[in-house]
């Protein structure tokens, strides 16, 4: 695979960087990512431009991604691109067929990779994907669309039609592919030949200006202008939504009934983020992989590794011996190197003390997080204002005088206005039910965990979490000293329809007993070190807990009937400006950051961070 042409020709052929000056965002489509040189050059130009757009979307197709080593080698050979190539190669993992969103420069440069059958993916995405520039990968000089199919990953006439469907009137295209002149004209492009650096072929410049009205044409509207927005809920879902919108220039006010953020389910002492795996690679598996990538990116940017989080991997113990990874996954950049992952799993299995024949799956791109630290870091971004100790009892829609826009008011129990904004996002977990006036069948789910202090901070403990039948984080620091007091946490119960807080003493004891039983199956090696803590909790039942006893922590989460998050407008026609990002259930650390990005993308009409069918599965319309 080669990257043809001089990189600047594509950039300048689309009138960049001048064309994007002063705009809130710019969207580029490239057919054939190759070694990523066009992306790297565009990224470098964006960085160097003081008038750059706030967001740079770069959507690229590729039939088969190259290795990270090849990517780095090609980028490092170009002056000025080596540092960017290194950043790109660090995120070059888990690239299975499908759509992947990679983020750079604090989320202001967004690379969306469409891998595999990219024409089908473009057709799926076209309702949300409208691009301003196209880098058309070139084809063999003797290729003729009437005689030969396009080589794998390169556009023939059907592919060019898929590209055209993603364009607006005025979208500019650059290519060295002189053999597609007629096909481009058929698809609605007006050609403007320009000399290229290759003496044998000219650089093609084209503008999408069809003389007909395509059935798939969408209004060439500017992206939604960032404005004011209220987010109701100060947990991980609300913080993720606020952070995603703030990066796009919105002014956010986050309201919560608690005085401090993360007072509900996001106040968990420590939790894990890890992908869900299934033999058929189902919807939740694909969704969780995208979610893990989003969580990893934010944790790297905003948290202190070893104190607030750890990218240590997670060992999944499948006690029921159910199948794990799909058999069709192969070694390479797609599956993160199945052979190397298998070796890592053997090493983790040996450390865990599980039997050699135990059914396990090693997740290298996973770890533990202290959720409250992540929430605080997200809410600390510019443009976000915290408004705590105010319980929103209901929402009221008000119409501005004359032709002014509709606004939403957040009211307390006495009917006093707490805040007002044209856009509001409900992200209040179990509290979303009341604000949505119980219009959807959301269900509260109480979760309890057992946790406690380690008596000896230097004691040798498993360096990574284990999940499966429950989950255990064997060790995490309680304060800001990695060598100071450390704790463990085991959980969690899933008590559907239970809202009572705090739990009754009998419920606490039942949860401790459940966690102790699960621990002996999940990770027998950790049972002896923690046995005294669980025994002390039983002995202290009904009394003040001793320092050595396992402690209880509980909160109420929220789930939808299908146990998937809900992201989208409540009722776009009847209730404009009212959105929801809720029902994370027990997967908030894995999915909330992704859901915040999905909501922001939908609100602003951007390219989606996940496949259209996954976004549809999360859409509020299913309620």
From Swiss-Prot:
> Which InterPro entries does the entry link to?
FAD-dep_OxRdtase (IPR006076), FAD/NAD-bd_sf (IPR036188), MnmC-like_methylTransf (IPR008471), SAM-dependent_MTases_sf (IPR029063), tRNA_S-uridine_synth_MnmC_C (IPR017610)
GO CC annotations, alphabetized: cytoplasm
Subcellular localization(s) per the UniProt record: Cytoplasm
**Stretch list, region FAD-dependent cmnm(5)s(2)U34 oxidoreductase:** 232-623
* Superkingdom, taxonomy of origin: Bacteria
A molecular function annotated in GO for this UniProt entry is:
oxidoreductase activity, acting on the CH-NH group of donors
Q: What are the recorded Gene Ontology BP terms?
A: methylation; tRNA processing
Is the Oxidoreductase keyword given for this protein? Answer: yes
Cofactor(s), by name: FAD
Annotated region described as tRNA (mnm(5)s(2)U34)-methyltransferase, given as residue ranges? 1-209
Transmembrane residues, as ranges? none
Q: What is its EC number?
A: 2.1.1.61, 1.5.-.-
Q: Does the keyword DNA-binding apply?
A: no
Swiss-Prot/TrEMBL catalytic activity: 5-aminomethyl-2-thiouridine(34) in tRNA + S-adenosyl-L-methionine = 5-methylaminomethyl-2-thiouridine(34) in tRNA + S-adenosyl-L-homocysteine + H(+)
Enumerate the UniProt keywords alphabetically: Cytoplasm, FAD, Flavoprotein, Methyltransferase, Multifunctional enzyme, Oxidoreductase, S-adenosyl-L-methionine, Transferase, tRNA processing
List the Pfam families hit by this protein, alphabetically: DAO (PF01266), Methyltransf_30 (PF05430)
The Swiss-Prot or TrEMBL record describes its family as follows: In the N-terminal section; belongs to the methyltransferase superfamily. tRNA (mnm(5)s(2)U34)-methyltransferase family.
Q: Briefly, what is this protein's role?
A: Catalyzes the last two steps in the biosynthesis of 5-methylaminomethyl-2-thiouridine (mnm(5)s(2)U) at the wobble position (U34) in tRNA. Catalyzes the FAD-dependent demodification of cmnm(5)s(2)U34 to nm(5)s(2)U34, followed by the transfer of a methyl group from S-adenosyl-L-methionine to nm(5)s(2)U34, to form mnm(5)s(2)U34.
Q: Which NCBIfam families match?
A: MnmC_Cterm
What is the name attached to this protein's record? tRNA 5-methylaminomethyl-2-thiouridine biosynthesis bifunctional protein MnmC
